[in-house]
Amino acid sequence: MGQTIKEIKARLADLTDLSAKEFLEFETDERAGVQAALKSRKKQILAECAEDERLEQMLEFEKELYSQEIELIAGIDEVGRGPLAGPVVTAAVILPKNCKIRGLNDSKKVPKSKHHAILSEIQEKALAIGVGIVDAEKIDEVNIYEATKIAMIQAVSKLSLKPEHLLIDAMVLDLPIAQTKIIHGDARSASIAAASIVAKVTRDEMMKDFALEFPEYDFEHNAGYGTAKHLAALTKYGITRIHRKSYEPIKSMVNFK
């Protein structure tokens, strides 16, 4: 008696190589259900191979350092330089050697629905994680660029392990640690991408909490960015303690110098 479609699907699920003899074996099965299962599994394997290749490319900078016997590599990234309200949040993440996390990418390229699952895997696998937070008052005092650097240095200081090298998205920090500045690093380095996810989820959760305190501004949806609803609330209710007075249109509203 031949195998049922359910049994064939179970066998296909175990295959990871398109050259496996089972694919040839099932090609001759004319049942529509078998052919659909074959097509689906082949598509999955191709997608998995493409993802493996992408993740391998995201270890390019890390592998260069591994070749120099440097393994404690901290990726650093920020979230929240552009919003009108809320803090700038940074993260530093040290991943184990050759760590691959499926779906890991620049947080802006990862569907929000997957942020928490990827964060959980980062937290499970990372050797160390540090987070830095600088509030709106400090941003107004020193400017967003300097505030971001302060937050990044905070994040590094909170790591439980001392990194041997820093991979940073487009910045250089005043720290006695070797560094590599990488443009668009959050999409090119696994370590920086991990930091971007940690920083993004941390900041989003903070903005949800601020939304409970200031419900009129829709912070849980706009994360402090200047959406139409947020700008309308500013006009109607004025600014809050978490608004950045050095950012327009708030700067003009309060005559910030």
UniProtKB/Swiss-Prot annotation:
EC numbers, comma separated: 3.1.26.4
InterPro entries, alphabetically? RNase_HII, RNase_HII/HIII, RNase_HII/HIII_dom, RNaseH-like_sf, RNaseH_sf
Where in the cell is the protein located? Cytoplasm
What does it catalyze?
A: Endonucleolytic cleavage to 5'-phosphomonoester
Q: How is the cofactor bound?
A: Manganese or magnesium. Binds 1 divalent metal ion per monomer in the absence of substrate. May bind a second metal ion after substrate binding.
The record's listing under Pfam families reads: RNase_HII
List the molecular function annotations (GO) for this entry: manganese ion binding; RNA binding; RNA-DNA hybrid ribonuclease activity
What range(s) does the RNase H type-2 domain occupy? 71-257
- Record-linked PANTHER family: RIBONUCLEASE H2 SUBUNIT A, RIBONUCLEASE HII
NCBIfam families attached to this UniProt entry: PRK00015.1-1, PRK00015.1-3
Q: Which HAMAP family match?
A: RNase_HII_B
Task: Give the protein family.
Answer: Belongs to the RNase HII family.
Q: What name does UniProt use for this protein? A: Ribonuclease HII
